[in-house]
Amino acid sequence: MNEMTHRTKTRPVKVGNLTIGGNNELIIQSMTTTKTHDVEATVAEIKRLEEAGCQVVRVAVPDERAANAIADIKKQINIPLVADIHFDYRLALKAIEGGIDKVRINPGNIGRRHKVEAVVNAAKERGIPIRIGVNAGSLERHILEKYGYPTADGMVESALHHIKILEDLDFHDIIVSMKASDVNLAIEAYEKAARAFDYPLHLGITESGTLFAGTVKSAAGLGAILSKGIGNTLRISLSADPVEEVKVARELLKSFGLASNAATLISCPTCGRIEIDLISIANEVEEYISTLQVPIKVAVLGCAVNGPGEAREADIGIAGARGEGLLFRKGQVVRKVPEEIMVEELKKEIDVIAAEMAAEREKEKETQEQ
């Protein structure tokens, strides 16, 4: 974890068995695409998200059927579950009763004070945090009239207004998001929010687009925010399989040294010197390491002359040549392997190193607990 780009003065907030904020690592979130009342389909999608590395998952709760399904879903998953609530406070109460781990609301659209108070009291009783979801596309009318259009200042004002509603009810387990589809607006809003309050910030670029365009847009916006040390949890919003959201989020955090539980692939861009099918090999290796929960660095390079030197930081790697490959660790050649088995040999080495890393991590954990 890179302390230089990590926001350490944020208030810690418990979400299930995790803590968001404080000096904890950023948490990856996603949201299901299923109808929440379809428990079987929702659980199946959540399990795929878990396997991909999702740490917190949100479900839409638009009606009573969805709210009533929360308890059954909770029994079958292993990561914290968040209920996305709009307008009807009774759905929030049912979700809390069903064992939800966090509620996402806008206090301003829940209704009169007694309704907000009912949700807050139920959340407080169960130790459940509330995320205030500010969105540039749904700011309050009086804020739009004041500023003329969605602005970062208007978004922060909206957040502070909602925060005050909860604080007036002596509720402080709050997480805030400041989402916008405009990248520059989102960056400015998160910067100003980070200065305005110390509650954990949930990062996201809303309505970012399809898999390709949305990945680029989210990486541009969230990368700029992360580089400033802002953010405690994030979701990459894509019009795609939500598993892809998790994959992009993991890669983004790895790029900033903010994920200590994910494998990294280093591969060269290819050129006319390459004698192997590097692209397909790189894709195969990337898929193989995608679910590893250790910070192993793996290199797949096409040039046996420059390859090992270009990936000195890799724990293990291969550099291809005609008919054979060089297997190397930390830039030092270990042995030559025939081309037809070099990927399998690389996978064996990956398994060995990953097991060593996992054992070392468990040993450190046991030492800390003593």
From Swiss-Prot:
Reaction equation(s) it catalyzes: (2E)-4-hydroxy-3-methylbut-2-enyl diphosphate + oxidized [flavodoxin] + H2O + 2 H(+) = 2-C-methyl-D-erythritol 2,4-cyclic diphosphate + reduced [flavodoxin]
Cofactor(s) required, per the database record: [4Fe-4S] cluster
Disulfide bonds: none
Cofactor info, note text: Binds 1 [4Fe-4S] cluster.
The EC number(s) this enzyme carries: 1.17.7.3
InterPro entries reported for this sequence: Dihydropteroate_synth-like_sf (IPR011005), IspG_bac (IPR016425), IspG_bac-typ (IPR004588), NO2/SO3_Rdtase_4Fe4S_sf (IPR045854)
Keywords: 4Fe-4S, Iron, Iron-sulfur, Isoprene biosynthesis, Metal-binding, Oxidoreductase
Residues engaged in binding [4Fe-4S] cluster: C268, C271, C303, E310
Domain of life: Bacteria
Enzyme's top EC category: oxidoreductase
GO biological process entries: isopentenyl diphosphate biosynthetic process, methylerythritol 4-phosphate pathway; terpenoid biosynthetic process
Pathway: Isoprenoid biosynthesis; isopentenyl diphosphate biosynthesis via DXP pathway; isopentenyl diphosphate from 1-deoxy-D-xylulose 5-phosphate: step 5/6
Entry's family note: Belongs to the IspG family.
Function statement: Converts 2C-methyl-D-erythritol 2,4-cyclodiphosphate (ME-2,4cPP) into 1-hydroxy-2-methyl-2-(E)-butenyl 4-diphosphate.
HAMAP family per the UniProt record, alphabetical: IspG (MF_00159)
PANTHER family in the record: 4-HYDROXY-3-METHYLBUT-2-EN-1-YL DIPHOSPHATE SYNTHASE (PTHR30454), 4-HYDROXY-3-METHYLBUT-2-EN-1-YL DIPHOSPHATE SYNTHASE (FERREDOXIN), CHLOROPLASTIC (PTHR30454:SF0)
Protein name: 4-hydroxy-3-methylbut-2-en-1-yl diphosphate synthase (flavodoxin)
Organism (species): Bacillus cereus (strain AH187)
Gene name of the record: ispG
